[in-house]
Amino acid sequence: MAGSSREYAAWALADYGFKVVIAGSFGDIHYNNELNNGMLPIVQPREVREKLAQLKPTDQVTVDLEQQKIISPVEEFTFEIDSEWKHKLLNSLDDIGITLQYEELIAAYEKQRPAYWQD
């Protein structure tokens, strides 16, 4: 297995099917671990979290990543996310996927780069 023991928390949430976690704060490492595992950590103030907690279990809450909104039956809330992470999540990209977007440029660079170790 790869990753630190701290990453197990994010893996556990992902294994249970969580796609979004709304909290008052996140530690930097956990926040990034959630993002790296395809989840969306959203920071919201207590007031918003309390309003969401008061909803009925049958009420549907939707998180619109593109519009950066949490949509509940009674109210909408906005949230912030880094534009690069937003792009990665919307396009199901990880670091390898991002690198592969530049595959042709990498190959072209490798072709023109001198091979100093070869005579």
From Swiss-Prot:
Q: Which InterPro entries match?
A: 3-IsopropMal_deHydase_ssu, Aconitase/3IPM_dehydase_swvl, AconitaseA/IPMdHydase_ssu_swvl, LeuD
**Pfam families assigned:** Aconitase_C
UniProt KW keywords? Amino-acid biosynthesis, Branched-chain amino acid biosynthesis, Leucine biosynthesis, Lyase
Is Mitochondrion tagged as a keyword? no
- What are the GO MF terms of this UniProt record? 3-isopropylmalate dehydratase activity
- Residue spans making up a coiled coil are none
Which reaction is recorded as catalysed by this protein? (2R,3S)-3-isopropylmalate = (2S)-2-isopropylmalate
GO-annotated biological processes: L-leucine biosynthetic process
Q: Which GO terms describe its cellular component?
A: 3-isopropylmalate dehydratase complex
Oligomer status and interactors = Heterodimer of LeuC and LeuD.
PANTHER family listed in its UniProt record: 3-ISOPROPYLMALATE DEHYDRATASE SMALL SUBUNIT, 3-ISOPROPYLMALATE DEHYDRATASE SMALL SUBUNIT 2-RELATED-RELATED
Query: Of which family is this protein a member?
Result: Belongs to the LeuD family. LeuD type 1 subfamily.
Q: What does this protein do?
A: Catalyzes the isomerization between 2-isopropylmalate and 3-isopropylmalate, via the formation of 2-isopropylmaleate.
Protein name stated in the entry? Putative 3-isopropylmalate dehydratase small subunit
The coding gene here is: leuD
